[in-house]
Amino acid sequence: MAQVLRGTVTDFPGFDERADAETLRKAMKGLGTDEESILTLLTSRSNAQRQEISAAFKTLFGRDLLDDLKSELTGKFEKLIVALMKPSRLYDAYELKHALKGAGTNEKVLTEIIASRTPEELRAIKQVYEEEYGSSLEDDVVGDTSGYYQRMLVVLLQANRDPDAGIDEAQVEQDAQALFQAGELKWGTDEEKFITIFGTRSVSHLRKVFDKYMTISGFQIEETIDRETSGNLEQLLLAVVKSIRSIPAYLAETLYYAMKGAGTDDHTLIRVMVSRSEIDLFNIRKEFRKNFATSLYSMIKGDTSGDYKKALLLLCGEDD
């Protein structure tokens, strides 16, 4: 049975964009800022509603809501609120653009987004990227990456994964054998084989291939990837396998490692919490609880502070 996906943020009932715009203006007018009002309001409205509030704010006060928020807020809290205000359909494209911009490339962001988005989502991201930035996402990725890592990203960006249909057992067997021969049984590794199979076969087919692979080789496919590849390609192949197995579980793990140990990767924490809040954050929470000895809520609570913490906990919903 397919998992029913649900977010933690939904449309606010009895929504009134003008009243909300007035609340926000009041929170920022005069001396000091009422952060509590801002975070409570914005985390309880859907992204579409936030865009309506923004429009009402301009109509009522002739001011840009985002500019006002940026000038009143600071630090990680500001970054989180700015992310919440970005139109959903632009958010992934914006994150990818920033991962590709400037001196270094942020491969972590490229890997996470491109590996965990569905073909439909990737097609939408490519279109928005081109409209917003006047260049093709694929061209920008090619210009900023290299080798097999680049090739795998390009294959995924084609968004031509087979649709889920009936399982062809013979094809499952053939792909599992091909992967075994391309990795464990070969001196060196035939990366092309991994890229083609991982990048084009359907999700249900690949899940069967991973099971069959275990039967044939005695290894989980992740163990083979770990042994046979390295660097960015290894990270990307692992992200693809984990996303094929379960996108919420992969993103739960991403959140866990963003907070585990010394220091917090706030960029990742904000990106996943915001981008999934209306899609599958509820499922991510459940996977988090299942796979780690704690809940997402309590980990955020122990790892963050101040208004930033309050806003993240409201996005998270309740403790599991």
UniProtKB/Swiss-Prot annotation:
The modification N6-acetyllysine is found at residues 70, 76, 79, 97, 101. The modification N-acetylalanine is found at residue 2. A motif ([IL]-x-C-x-x-[DE] motif) lies at residues 314-319. S-nitrosylation is induced by interferon-gamma and oxidatively-modified low-densitity lipoprotein (LDL(ox)) possibly implicating the iNOS-S100A8/9 transnitrosylase complex. Keywords: Acetylation, Annexin, Blood coagulation, Calcium, Calcium/phospholipid-binding, Hemostasis, Isopeptide bond, Phosphoprotein, Repeat, S-nitrosylation, Ubl conjugation. One of its GO terms (cellular component) is extracellular region. One of its GO terms (biological process) is signal transduction. One of its GO terms (molecular function) is phospholipid binding. Annexin repeats lie at residues 15-86, 87-158, 170-242, 246-317. Coiled coil: none annotated. PROSITE patterns: ANNEXIN_1 (PS00223), ANNEXIN_2 (PS51897). There is a cross-link at residue 29 (Glycyl lysine isopeptide (Lys-Gly) (interchain with G-Cter in SUMO1)). There is a cross-link at residue 29 (Glycyl lysine isopeptide (Lys-Gly) (interchain with G-Cter in SUMO2)). Pfam families: Annexin. The modification Phosphoserine is found at residue 37. The modification N6-succinyllysine is found at residue 290. It comes from the Eukaryota. This protein is an anticoagulant protein that acts as an indirect inhibitor of the thromboplastin-specific complex, which is involved in the blood coagulation cascade. Monomer. Binds ATRX and EIF5B. Interacts with hepatitis B virus (HBV). Belongs to the annexin family. The [IL]-x-C-x-x-[DE] motif is a proposed target motif for cysteine S-nitrosylation mediated by the iNOS-S100A8/A9 transnitrosylase complex. A pair of annexin repeats may form one binding site for calcium and phospholipid. It is linked to Pregnancy loss, recurrent, 3: A common complication of pregnancy, resulting in spontaneous abortion before the fetus has reached viability. The term includes all miscarriages from the time of conception until 24 weeks of gestation. Recurrent pregnancy loss is defined as 3 or more consecutive spontaneous abortions. This is Annexin A5. It comes from Homo sapiens.
